[in-house]
UniProtKB/Swiss-Prot annotation:
Family: Belongs to the succinate/malate CoA ligase beta subunit family.
Residues that coordinate or bind substrate: N264, G321, I322, V323
Any one annotated GO CC term: succinate-CoA ligase complex
Domain ATP-grasp: 9-244
Source organism: Aliivibrio salmonicida (strain LFI1238)
An MF annotation (GO) of this entry: magnesium ion binding
InterPro entries linked to this entry: ATP-grasp (IPR011761), ATP-grasp_succ-CoA_synth-type (IPR013650), ATP_grasp_subdomain_1 (IPR013815), Succ-CoA_synthase_bsu_CS (IPR017866), SUCC_ACL_C (IPR005811), Succ_CoA_ligase-like_bsu (IPR005809), Succinyl-CoA_synth-like (IPR016102)
Name of the featured protein: Succinate--CoA ligase [ADP-forming] subunit beta
Single GO biological process annotation from the record: tricarboxylic acid cycle
Coiled coil: none
Binding site for ATP: K46, G53, R54, G55, E99, S102, E107
Broad EC category: ligase
Keyword Ligase among UniProt keywords: yes
UniProt keywords, alphabetically: ATP-binding, Ligase, Magnesium, Metal-binding, Nucleotide-binding, Tricarboxylic acid cycle
Length: 388
């Protein structure tokens, strides 16, 4: 689950990290009043969406007057912001963040992720702030400095000092950086974060550090024990089908193709998408119904796939291990009867109760195309999507 910038900064402030004075606003009038409370001559106003590239897309502006801030809010609230990280539709803007402008002398980068190789939280810092860190990692990886956090003792001050020295910080700036580093390290563990990023972490003209931006991603598997963060969830930033799928514990990701895929197991789902591509098709989604799929969940999965108007055919690829193929068949039959499927459906069942599942499908009287191998299933669904 992602947080908005203003939400990330709220958490930063709770841990004593320096953030600009700012206010999240739902209306243009609120933005106007917020600008009046900010003492700096210039005000920054930012669209709040779960996507990067806001500045280049016109979603971040600097204004001298309260009226300018209000006009910006009127322009964007209720509209969609399209950036290089969104689809053509963009993300809806329901809030804008109005905050004080900062005198920036230097921009740094500070972030943290869970490193699966070392099984530790790893901090990354760089003097190249304000730019795409992936690009820096690819072109000049020597500019990225790392510190791995021992889970037994947590973040240590000496690690913060080492990073500060490598970033060229001096004097009181080192103390400020260590405080930020320790705060972020503790916050990362306490809130079950998967990713944390401050880009840029700026050095102001006065020589102080300031968290000018904030990006936080929370481990969805830990949301059950993070009620505070659950309240920060913004469903407007998610694909409606993905949000609906999550309610049924289905792993669904919308894509741009025309062949709907329903598979059990993430690895098999990716392999299915690959072989569909190999035979000239384009998957419309990734959908893993999981090992504990029930008839109801399969029916719901089918509904979600068919709610995409781009879907021209559906491929169901099930390997029965924990899940029984006959239950999958019941779900397919129920969904087809309930929804009234107008597109071809290709089904490949293997494993636990596969013969019984195939028998149920054959006796249903529905227009379902059977396949006995993954290659055959891919060939048939691609042909069906093309109307052959």
């Amino acid at each position: 689950m992602n947080l908005h910038e203003y939400q990330a900064k709220q958490l930063f402030a709770e841990y004593g990290l320096p953030v600009p004075e700012g206010y999240a606003c739902d209306t243009a009038q609120e933005a106007f009043e917020a600008a009046g409370r900010i003492s700096t001559a210039k005000k920054v106003v930012k669209c709040q969406v779960h996507a990067g590239g806001r500045g280049k897309a016109g979603g971040v502006e600097l204004h001298d007057t309260k009226e300018g801030v209000k006009e910006f809010a009127q322009k964007w609230l209720g509209k969609n912001l399209v950036t290089f990280q969104t689809d053509a539709k963009g993300q809806p803007v329901t809030k804008v963040l109005v905050e004080e402008a900062s005198n920036i002398a230097n921009e740094l980068y500070l972030g943290a992720v869970v490193d699966r190789a070392t099984r530790r939280i790893v901090f990354m810092a760089s003097t190249e702030g304000g730019v795409d860190i992936e690009k820096i990692a690819e072109e000049t990886p020597e500019l990225i400095h790392q510190a791995a956090i021992d889970p037994l003792v947590g973040p240590q001050a000496f690690q913060g000092r080492e990073l500060a020295f490598k970033l060229g910080l001096e004097g009181d700036q080192i103390k400020q950086f260590v405080k930020i580093f320790l705060g972020l390290g503790n916050m990362f563990a306490q809130y079950d974060l998967a990713l944390l990023e401050i880009n840029p972490l700026v050095v102001t003209a006065e020589g102080n550090l300031l968290c000018l931006d904030g990006k936080i991603n929370i481990d969805s598997n830990a949301m059950y024990r993070q009620p505070k963060l659950r309240e920060m969830h913004d469903p407007s930033q998610e694909d409606e089908r993905e949000a609906h799928a999550a309610q049924w514990e289905l792993n669904y990701v919308a894509l741009d193709g025309s062949i709907g895929c329903m598979v059990n197991g993430a690895g098999l789902a990716m392999g299915t998408m690959d072989i569909v591509n190999l035979h000239g098709g384009q998957p419309a989604n990734f959908l893993d119904v999981g090992g504990g799929a029930t008839k109801e969940r399969v029916t719901e999965a089918f509904k979600i796939i068919l709610s995409d108007s781009n879907v021209k055919a559906v491929l169901v690829n099930i390997f029965g291990g924990i899940v029984r193929c006959d239950l999958i068949a019941d779900g397919i039959i129920g969904a087809v009867e309930e929804v009234g499927v107008k597109v071809p459906v290709v089904v490949r069942l293997e494993g636990n109760n596969a013969p019984l599942g195939s028998q149920k499908l054959a006796e249903s009287g529905l227009n379902i195309i059977a396949a006995t191998s993954l290659t055959e299933a891919a060939e048939k669904v691609v042909a069906a999507a093309e109307g052959k």
